[in-house]
């Protein structure tokens, strides 16, 4: 049976990259939803020209943008079977979406994460603080939750009904870790697929600044320790 698939792309000032991301998404996808997170450049214009549905979320925060996309889908008559989350900076390879959704379709896996493994990462595509933060977070998840996750990457696919069951709430930097921790707690079946990763177009709004890195790190650790006591 053909699956109904939607992609949600949070985007903040990604005018130079957003069309490339959209154009590389496989045609199997039914709808591409770009959520402009208060962008001040031509992100919205370029996304519209490339064929995406464009939503506006004035409240800054990765989670706010993702939740906006989910609310839009919830209000539609026809619900998808699979939701894919993808960043708008062209650091991921959108064509690998097929590799992420295949285990869901063929093996009935609930949640598939694109893992940015060292062997497939372009040099410099992840900052030292990102690499260390990923290692620390996934190590703590292994110790506290017996998790086998190796990454917190944003490129991920999940069954729509499972996503709704997670009752996602984080508004900012903790969105990805929240999803993984809740999936573990609810005993979802999950899988990591190694994905390629390249240097993004433009400057990162999180890992590209000291403030963003610190805030993201604090939020991630907060989620881990919050769930370790539940």
Where are these regions (language model features)?
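A conserved acidic beta->alpha catalytic loop
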Residues: 36-45
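Short beta-strand-to-loop acidic/aromatic patch adjacent to the donor-nucleotide binding site
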Residues: 79-91
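Acceptor/aglycone-binding surface of glycosyltransferases and processive sugar-polymer synthases
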Residues: 58-60, 64-71, 94-173, 200-211, ...
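Hydrophobic helical membrane-anchoring modules
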Residues: 1-2, 16, 146, 168-230
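Short, well-formed alpha-helical segments that are part of the catalytic scaffolds
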Residues: 12-28
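Conserved donor nucleotide-binding strand/loop of the catalytic core
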Residues: 44-76
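Donor nucleotide-sugar binding loop of glycosyltransferases
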Residues: 14-17, 39, 93
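Short loop->beta transition adjacent to catalytic acidic/histidine clusters or analogous donor-positioning motifs
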Residues: 2-5, 26-34, 81
